[in-house]
């Protein structure tokens, strides 16, 4: 009203009033009136999607900025949107020129690399900022300065993937790419084999055809368990369906997807398969502000008309939408810092750049902001994003984290953040393997596992029942009890299946495996619970738990028939060699004693003490007397010959000590040899087997025992394997039962595990274990290599061991009736068959003594008769020559008397010479 009165009064409009009004219109009004800043967007469309998600995010960001005046209080952001067909770079260039002519402060899009290059070239020529949010292959000679790209650098993502591969210690990796740009994005990983011990196999998805089943079939056949997929999220959704169809969605596979939209896919169908699925996430959903924006976006999308099926969760914000949202905000931040930003109309054909373009471009590159995709900063030189974080997420069954908003709750429920990769500091895993195993029942509870096993008493046997049995009830044994205990601890359900070929698992000359090991390698079974030996060659292709039983290889052989001691069994306590050595020792000691007794002067004595001047001395230790002394000492009897000299006493004392030990040892062993029936076995050890060929021996075909001898470098075992391999048709048996029957019925020795031998000998008294253990090893639960169940099974086995349940189970299944009849043979009365030889020796000695006495009598009689005749004849001749007679009666008498005297004198001389020996 006041302004109306003032104007109505004439004469009050003056020159000063005019200048004031002009000042207000030129200076005050522009500063207080809201400015308008126009930005342009070029977006590609497809037939079934007229409006893509980037355009929606572009509009969503502009609307959010205009509603919230805190960022641009005096500026209103407007936009101009142009839509082009996919891959149409010419149309993209034309639409870009149209927008530049209209006057825009920055230009967003398009997405495809060829269109991006065309628009970027125009923006660089006219010095207008070009904002990019998609990965673009950088040109080597690119000198464009007027662009920024919010998408993480391809080299950085490739390094992140390589760091993750090294962290998981993957030795073989399969890279599956969708198009040729995938090989460019994964350059750091592809070059890894030259620097790290990693084998990389590269495969390409079929182009145009979405059927990847043939490719997946090859991967399954090649046992390629660690796979990196470089593809879009649409392709990833389709690939996952086919992976499930091929039966490759199991806990043995680990899939990594390079798409940053993996978290946005609907993976509810795969959560409980046990598969390992890992990816990167750029959205910073841990930030409550980010979560609230995502919720708003989701609400708007759910209210919009339904979109074509893309595999994404309904209303989920993708990474490309978040990047576009952040890109608009980065331009808004830069424009807020710029004062008096005037946008000019530019013509492509004039090549006249925007005057404020370089300054505005620098403001954008210098801008910093914590957006939906984390902290955003740019490299001022190349315009690429730097110092960004990638969340490492892993698919899980159930979550415990809490988040605001339904979308965030779902993300936390399906995905678990296990680490962060920063472009500067690298990998930082926050969820270690130890944390994952804190509760050992987490991943096994209510999961059904396929268990492969083999019939082997007492580990796995058919249950005897009058009623038909089905499923796991068909079997019983130690391994079934072990499975039941493991199931009670870990909470899993199991389905027991016998191995089709009935073998444990061995490798042929071509490197192919069979038996239970092959079942695990081919992932037809999750566990192998059987008497499966932990060996080096098996450990290279499958994993083992800690052993639940320790054992070794030994020899199973039938008990030899008992032989009663013979009549000369009293000789058995000492070997024939010892008997010979004792006899030689007795003869040697006798000779030494004879020589020393002759040599020492203290063994000579005067036989006539009353005549000290006698020159006649005697020595008791003649050769026969020395031998008699030795025999008497050996038989522990006296010989009435006592050595007098110190030297001869030393010989006698040492001989007595020798005989003491020999007789004591003989006496100690005599009772056992005479009273116990001896079991004489032709073999006592593996060396005895190797030294002979009469007794055939072998092992179970394709078992760990056979593998042990096949791989052994010890000469004895190499010789044994040469014997077995030369007779494979007869030496090697199909299973233990066949081998046991051969041991019982033929001359055959079976090499097998000591625990099995212990079980068999408890129930068959005709069999026994020969020798000790050849080696030491253990039985373990087998799992496919890389199985997540191995550590959990190991912990459960250690728990059973500490509780003593493993020992109780073995006692239950190994305890048998025994062989008590063995005890009755330990003591028995001696009969003639035991010691009859002693009587034979006695009788032989008596008979021998009689014959020796007769021989001595005859020998002495003949010797005396010869001496008397010789002397009578000799002295008769002497008498006739000395005393010739004249008369027959006188001379003859004298001669006879002289002859008799001479004969008597000669006999006296001979007798004296026989007593006094010098």
From Swiss-Prot:
Coiled coil (residue ranges): none
Cytoplasmic side: 598-653, 856-918
Range of residues in the leader sequence: 1-30
Transmembrane segments: 577-597, 654-674, 835-855
Subcellular localization(s) per the UniProt record: Cell membrane; Postsynaptic cell membrane
Parts of the chain on the Extracellular side: 31-576, 675-834
Keywords per UniProt: Cell membrane, Disulfide bond, Glycoprotein, Ion channel, Ion transport, Ligand-gated ion channel, Membrane, Phosphoprotein, Postsynaptic cell membrane, Receptor, Signal, Synapse, Transmembrane, Transmembrane helix, Transport
Topological type in the membrane: Multi-pass membrane protein
Keyword Ion transport tagged: yes
One GO MF term attached to the UniProt entry: glutamate-gated receptor activity
Disulphide bond pairs: 765-819
Residues the record lists as Phosphothreonine modifications: 761
Residues that hold L-glutamate according to the record: 531, 533, 538, 704-705, 753
SUPFAM superfamilies: Periplasmic binding protein-like I, Periplasmic binding protein-like II
An individual GO BP term: nervous system development
Swiss-Prot/TrEMBL catalytic activity: Ca(2+)(in) = Ca(2+)(out)
Similarity annotation: Belongs to the glutamate-gated ion channel (TC 1.A.10.1) family. GRIK1 subfamily.
Its biological purpose: Ionotropic glutamate receptor that functions as a cation-permeable ligand-gated ion channel, gated by L-glutamate and the glutamatergic agonist kainic acid. L-glutamate acts as an excitatory neurotransmitter at many synapses in the central nervous system. Binding of the excitatory neurotransmitter L-glutamate induces a conformation change, leading to the opening of the cation channel, and thereby converts the chemical signal to an electrical impulse. The receptor then desensitizes rapidly and enters a transient inactive state, characterized by the presence of bound agonist.
Subunit comment: Homotetramer or heterotetramer of pore-forming glutamate receptor subunits. Tetramers may be formed by the dimerization of dimers. Can form functional heteromeric receptors with GRIK5. Can form functional heteromeric receptors with GRIK4. Interacts with KLHL17.
Protein name, UniProt field: Glutamate receptor ionotropic, kainate 1
Species the sequence originates in: Homo sapiens (Human)
Organism phylogeny: Eukaryota, Metazoa, Chordata, Craniata, Vertebrata
Gene that produces this protein: GRIK1
